Amino acid sequence: MIWHVQNENFILDSTRIFMKAFHLLLFDGSFIFPECILIFGLILLLMIDSTSDQKDIPWLYFISSTSFVMSITALLFRWREEPMISFSGNFQTNNFNEIFQFLILLCSTLCIPLSVEYIECTEMAITEFLLFVLTATLGGMFLCGANDLITIFVAPECFSLCSYLLSGYTKKDVRSNEATMKYLLMGGASSSTLVHGFSWLYGSSGGEIELQEIVNGLINTQMYNSPGISIALIFITVGIGFKLSLAPSHQWTPDVYQGSPTPVVAFLSVTSKVAASALATRIFDIPFYFSSNEWHLLLEILAILSMILGNLIAITQTSMKRMLAYSSIGQIGYVIIGIIVGDSNGGYASMITYMLFYISMNLGTFACIILFGLRTGTDNIRDYAGLYTKDPFLALSLALCLLSLGGLPPLAGFFGKLHLFWCGWRAGLYFLVSIGLLTSVLSIYYYLKIIKLLMTGRNQEITPHVRNYRISPLRSTNSIELSMIVCVIASTIPGISMNPIIAIAQDSPF
């Protein structure tokens, strides 16, 4: 009899939960329509994988790419709609969040063609790879719109778990396994640190979890200047610093970059930065509104450390991927300037603009590295010597992307940094901007050092890898080369006409 009553209660509770979930999805589902498209793409991939013995690989790529393109289209159709909070306060939709979602989708869309030939050559499992990329993208998109502490914790964990699996995708490679273990252990530690900071916020605000309600709760409890908020700020900054690869939480980055498959590195190098930047912008600007001076100081210190250490250590690297890892640590230091400046002086607009350019510059560079690695089997910087004599197109593409990363005019990277530094200067961040300018000049040195190697024509300096290099045909249908062309064009032309991009970014108030 007791068992029968308990069983009935369980059925009633389950029915209530199901009906509540159905009600939320029915009335609030339109707010996550772009995310639903990706979920539908995931289901299709799983169905094809479970029902087909001979997997039609082109269809798998087509479904993944189409899901991303359709999701981008849904975002564009929703542009300029009124900001809305849905799912009982868990999710917020506005133009600012949608720009970051667009950037994540753009990264994923460009990374799919970069992976095709690499996966075919290395005989990696294609379905699982695409599933992890789609799921990581989904986690990043939910993070951009997250409006409460639970969603802010769960969404990046979804992204992180897929990142761990992707970084260790080549299971027979010892370096890949080592990178995965380091990434997993340090990622777990950073997540614990982050959630500990959230617990201090939750307690100090009187039990609130929504971002804006936390601010109201801190006012009601008079805890907005308490030691508890300072503790929360320190722990959350450390956790976000890991996600952004900010010094001194950057140690995992070079090992993961070197040990992971190159298309995975290309994907993680941009999507993780975009998603973590969206998280940092929201978490610092809303719950820590009353502690702006404190978190400004913390981020300034971390940005200075990242710009100096990242660019100094990059000079000494012999691996191209490790060099780009340290370069990315320096690059995120520049992005932090926009976060510190905030919305009042155009800081967020300059950050978004530079992030868009960074996506094209970085993915273009990785496309060149993937092509060179597939044709030579090496990642050593010295082995790029004389590449121009064998493949001028690849050498020029790599040179343009590196020069844009360094910030040389008239490329996109120069105008992106110029606008970012100008906004910082107007906001009074003179020392931070000065460090940014000096480290940008320093970064040009190691980029030019690589370009000098590319263009060398002396036979004694050309390595056997380049001498035996497979020259690609003039007309190539290689998907990596197509992505590379798109990224190279995006790294050069937008710098000349970037006003529309800045206008769109400024039209998305926080």
Swiss-Prot record:
EC number(s) per entry: 7.1.1.-
Reactions that this protein is recorded to catalyse: a plastoquinone + NADH + (n+1) H(+)(in) = a plastoquinol + NAD(+) + n H(+)(out); a plastoquinone + NADPH + (n+1) H(+)(in) = a plastoquinol + NADP(+) + n H(+)(out)
Annotated Pfam families: Ndh2_N (PF19530), Proton_antipo_M (PF00361)
Example of a GO cellular component annotation carried by this entry: chloroplast thylakoid membrane
GO biological process, one term: photosynthesis, light reaction
Spans traversing the lipid bilayer: 24-44, 57-77, 99-119, 124-144, 149-169, 183-203, 227-247, 295-315, 323-343, 354-374, 395-415, 428-448, 484-504
Family: Belongs to the complex I subunit 2 family.
Function: NDH shuttles electrons from NAD(P)H:plastoquinone, via FMN and iron-sulfur (Fe-S) centers, to quinones in the photosynthetic chain and possibly in a chloroplast respiratory chain. The immediate electron acceptor for the enzyme in this species is believed to be plastoquinone. Couples the redox reaction to proton translocation, and thus conserves the redox energy in a proton gradient.
Protein name: NAD(P)H-quinone oxidoreductase subunit 2, chloroplastic
Organism listed in the record: Brassica napus
